[in-house]
């Protein structure tokens, strides 16, 4: 069984886009873990493109983390899907049926990819948390120097910790796993540290739920930008500098978050969704 795929790079976020429109076969845990363990195919997320189940959508996407768990959102992965669709002549503007609802995206004139990530959710009663939270702008959770987080859902849950010094000096590989698995988060959580560099920019590092330390996380960049604006630290339209590069985030007055940035192709080929075996297309 051959499934076309492209290995892509969304600012260092390693993404596999798999064209599963002609298949009813699900990706098996065996296949996902085999691909994740392969040095060349190792990924942060797999974005599986399927035919839509809703009339208002052009395509349906499933999202898988490297540990085999399902994800509800992946901003950089969605940008890679939009790029793949435009490069395969499906159009320029798309409505994608994602786990969190309909997501709109398009290719810009400058070849950057923009995605409307929808509206953030600050209501703790609608978040998978284990205790009552009165104010999601300031939650009582601590790990080492990290404290006083802002909790936001961008379809998936994010905790943003603001620090005064550069984000590279904090060992997120040490504190990230502890916070991801904190009892407050029964379904785990994405953990980011942010440092404000100006009213128009911030630096961000992320420990991603189910993927670990990543070069970039699009939904975390959105959460970081919104959290900074909520605390009156930045403007609505800012650059978020990640280890893998820069994303432009615009938190519009209608509450929608627009994320824009580049993507790169690495290689394409065919994979077996049952086993994870794959072959590059050298044509």
From Swiss-Prot:
It catalyses: (2S,6S)-2,6-diaminopimelate = meso-2,6-diaminopimelate. Substrate binds at residues 13, 45, 65, 75-76, 156, 190, 208-209, 218-219. The keyword Metal-binding does not apply. PROSITE patterns: DAP_EPIMERASE. It is found in: Cytoplasm. Keywords: Amino-acid biosynthesis, Cytoplasm, Isomerase, Lysine biosynthesis. PANTHER family: DIAMINOPIMELATE EPIMERASE, DIAMINOPIMELATE EPIMERASE, CHLOROPLASTIC. HAMAP family: DAP_epimerase. This is Diaminopimelate epimerase. The gene is dapF.
């Amino acid at each position: 069984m051959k499934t076309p795929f492209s290995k892509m790079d969304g600012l260092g976020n390693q993404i596999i886009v798999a064209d599963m429109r002609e298949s009813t076969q699900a990706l098996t845990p065996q296949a996902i873990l085999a691909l994740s363990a392969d040095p060349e195919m190792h990924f942060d997320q797999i974005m599986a493109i399927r035919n839509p189940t809703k009339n208002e959508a052009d395509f349906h996407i499933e999202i898988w983390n490297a540990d085999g768990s399902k994800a509800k959102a992946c901003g950089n992965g969605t940008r890679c899907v939009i790029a793949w669709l435009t490069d395969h002549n499906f159009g320029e503007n798309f409505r994608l049926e994602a786990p969190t609802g309909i997501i709109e995206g398009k290719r810009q004139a400058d070849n950057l990819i923009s995605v409307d990530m929808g509206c953030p959710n600050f209501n703790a009663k609608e978040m998978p948390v284990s205790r009552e939270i009165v104010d999601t702008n300031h939650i009582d959770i601590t790990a080492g120097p990290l404290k006083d987080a802002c909790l936001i859902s961008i379809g998936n849950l994010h905790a943003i910790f603001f620090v005064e010094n550069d984000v590279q000096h904090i060992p997120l590989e040490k504190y990230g796993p502890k916070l991801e698995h904190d009892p407050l988060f029964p379904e785990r959580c994405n953990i980011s540290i942010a440092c404000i560099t100006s009213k128009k920019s911030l630096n961000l590092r992320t420990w991603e739920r189910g993927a670990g330390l990543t070069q970039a996380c699009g939904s975390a960049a959105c959460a970081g930008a919104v959290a900074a604006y909520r605390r009156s630290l930045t403007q609505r339209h800012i650059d978020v500098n990640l280890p893998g590069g820069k994303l432009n985030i615009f938190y519009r007055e209608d509450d929608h978050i627009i994320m824009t940035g580049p993507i790169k192709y690495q290689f394409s080929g065919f994979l077996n969704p049952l086993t994870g075996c794959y072959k590059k297309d050298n044509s």
